[in-house]
Amino acid sequence: MRKRARIIYNPTSGKELFKRTLPDVLIKLEKAGFETSAYATEKVGDATTEAARSLEQNYDVLIAAGGDGTLNEVINGIAEKPNRPSLGIIPMGTVNDFGRALHLPTDIMSAIDVIIEGHMTRVDIGKMNSRYFINLAAGGQLTQVSYETPSKLKSIVGPFAYYIKGFEMLPQMKAVDIRIEYDDEVFQGEALLFLLGLTNSMAGFEKLVPDAKLDDGYFTLIIVEKANLAELGHIMTLASRGEHTKHPKVHYKKAKSISVSSFTDMQLNVDGEYGGKLPGNFLNLKQHIEVFTPNDIKNEEIIEQ
């Protein structure tokens, strides 16, 4: 019996490469036994709406082609529903954090091959208040880097654009008095930022969570206490090597449930996009989504980053 697949794609991602390649993608999937149709997003929220509609129409497979923002929208369209379809991913963004974590190829046809081969892995996702995320949630000025970095700069220098913007923002950073409750522990004090990670790759930092596991039901919680400019620059340098976890101003914990509050405004970042402001309640949904992954990589290699 032929499987029904629905492609949801951002036509502007990757310099419109997927849009131009779509006819070949449809032919390849058709030959592999998939009855496939496609939907192009036009504005924020379209991918969420279409993903929910596709689920109601009983598609077996959803394929998200775009950056981490497109993938996040698709997840938000299906996360609350039963009988969720399997998820295929074609990484077309600047950084593609989740795709990196799953070792997915960035070549379009190679990514389609991963879906055709049919090897799947169940992964955790996070819930923040009423919305979902698949890679990270964070708070603090530095976490605004991903959505404040100019698109033109990202297109020119790729992921390095985030480093440039990050160092540019360092002098502006201010600590916020914050309360973070996680499982049976509490952090209360001044912090520059906090971050909840589901994978090892965030804004191009592939070693930010060096011991990330994608299916264990735990977030990695990183809290950076108030620090001076030199200390913060040092922490960022250490983070590029995965050595920040031992810095005295860095708290590195594992938790299933986290609650964050403050009397001061703090913006939130969810999968690289603006996520509102505190307070935030975060819950890890263990092995909630089934995604296609390369079959020449063992699950343990994906899960134990």
UniProtKB/Swiss-Prot annotation:
Residues 1-132 form the DAGKc domain. This is Diacylglycerol kinase. Keywords: ATP-binding, Kinase, Lipid biosynthesis, Lipid metabolism, Magnesium, Metal-binding, Nucleotide-binding, Phospholipid biosynthesis, Phospholipid metabolism, Transferase. The active site is at E273 (proton acceptor). It comes from the Bacteria. Homodimer. Catalyzes the phosphorylation of diacylglycerol (DAG) into phosphatidic acid. Is a key enzyme involved in the production of lipoteichoic acid by reintroducing DAG formed from the breakdown of membrane phospholipids into the phosphatidylglycerol biosynthetic pathway. The keyword Lipid metabolism applies. Binds 1 Mg(2+) ion per subunit. This ion appears to have a structural role and is required for catalytic activity. Coiled coil: none annotated. It catalyses: a 1,2-diacyl-sn-glycerol + ATP = a 1,2-diacyl-sn-glycero-3-phosphate + ADP + H(+). Its EC number is 2.7.1.107. Belongs to the diacylglycerol/lipid kinase family. The keyword Lipid biosynthesis applies. ATP binds at N10, P11, T12, S13, G14, T41, G67, D68, G69, T70, L71, N72, E73, T94. SMART domains: DAGKc. Gene3D superfamilies: 2.60.200.40, Probable inorganic polyphosphate/atp-NAD kinase, domain 1. SUPFAM superfamilies: NAD kinase/diacylglycerol kinase-like. Mg(2+) binds at K213, D216, Y218. One of its GO terms (molecular function) is metal ion binding. Its cofactor is Mg(2+). It is an enzyme of class 2 (transferase). GO terms for biological process: phospholipid biosynthetic process. One of its GO terms (cellular component) is plasma membrane.
